[in-house]
């Protein structure tokens, strides 16, 4: 039996904890879960009720235990207790009956539901009422339960109670018998697989700690969904609390609103969340037209917001304005929020973390951190350093905070990634780190960091300069797909010219929609060649329009928010694709990779672009052997049976290499800018200067001969 605590109330509820420990010990060899303070129940206009213990297993079914500390058996108190038990029992039963996958027939379930009362301070069992006063009586009753159901049914039951079934439902796909082998049918099966939480996700979403919490994992581990459920849960349990949900990628806004709404409506039987006053979903910056965390914080603290035009004069504009805010308030601003939830936290400078901490009460700050999304940041974040400054040198120490609640976790690692099939994820990581490049570009700092992300270090020490072999843990990539059904998971096209690359992309998109039955919104196109992205998308739109395929270009000037539009293929930059995904992704213009193969920036872009693809990845570029380097590294990965087998280099040495390369690059850029300035002053074009240089070089070579 695995125990999970979702509330820190256990500290004062010793009798309940004692019962949990006794049940856990007696049934330690039985597969199942013991959940403390689960699920939260909200009836219309009534207070939230939470069962104290819920046990779920194949041989016990669902057992709910409600605890009351009454000292004396009084009829009035007992009647109130019985009513509470009845409300919980009815809620559990009706919630499960709403799920067609759990119904045996019109009136019964595939899993039994038993609700018990526990009054440890009384001396008499009320057996007829299933109310007991001792642990031994509870255990004796549980022993008599004779249940037999499947693990699938148990997991489905928990999913129904935790509101995971309110996740975005798989799209309606009209598929006939003749479509059973199409990509659309496979996608439908995969979407069904991931429509519930695993244990780590459940713990992350429903744990309510009185203090800070970090949730981290790979892209696709469900962090945004988890944070949205947490926001909805906080709003339900603490209706007067003001909850801030902030994020980095503007295109996520609609998705976040939709998820919080779905979860909250499911929890409260149809009520709408109060986005106006209590749940504030805001982008980090904001302005006069659009609310934002920084802008609103300034207004609330009597500070004039710094404009973007002014801020960009100081380098990193957003970092600058956040630092100025922290200095202006001396890290002690007005506490505007009861809880602050930060999504995509890896993309923010530490100054934004500090701004958020300064405007929330009691350090109720929860951040979701993608450990490899920002490939520059391969060293594990240290919260003490993240939150420390001259006003508070200590920062936030999660280890010390954890000691207050030893049965709970304030630093949760999500080991599983649901976004990509394993092959795509491994290709993305291999290219992102330069595993099979002639020089390693970056790596994780030690074995534990790899293991936290769902990998197994088969050989070697990742903190040293030595050969290491690393493989993906099967359980960490749970998308179950028959390999024979995704033989074309990754396809690559080297086009002779630009026009033929565009023709191929348009033809493949048309085939995916007409033959493979994918919906247009299942498909996204991301351009790696950002210099030519306008040209790519403009011409691709024309080709697709000729095939009656609509497009949604999130790079258009009039774009506001959202990544998907029903009936449209999405065209996106890498930046706006972050945090989003599509079943089939075309990463185009990849010929720019070869010349920048030693650049961390380019490797980061490739990793981000590739990991947007859930099942099918299409890669293209223009020019003969334009993808030679990329193909070489991918083939090396395949030859090594999709394991990482490489000479490791400690992260501090890799950083030194990168800094030296960056310095050389900066010198080259400075020279180039000087050359441009000189050409303008002298009235000589750069092309003419290069022509003169080439001619002079040839003349010098002749003299040498």
Model-derived features with residue positions:
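Accessory nucleic-acid engagement/destabilization modules that flank
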Residues: 1-175
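P-loop NTPase Walker
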Residues: 34-67, 151-289, 611
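Short, flexible/disordered intra-domain loops and linkers
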Residues: 44, 74-83, 292-315, 378-390, ...
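Conserved P-loop NTPase-based nucleic-acid remodeling module centered on helicase motor cores
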Residues: 57-97, 110, 126-136, 260-332, ...
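Surface-exposed acidic, glycine-flexible loop patches that form ligand/cofactor-binding
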Residues: 102-106, 331, 514-518
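Alpha-helix-centered segments that form part of catalytic cores
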Residues: 179-192, 315-327, 470-497
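Conserved helicase NTPase motor core
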Residues: 181, 185-207, 212-216, 281-284, ...
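Conserved helicase motor core of SF1/SF2 NTP-dependent helicases
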Residues: 214-244, 248-273, 285-288, 339, ...
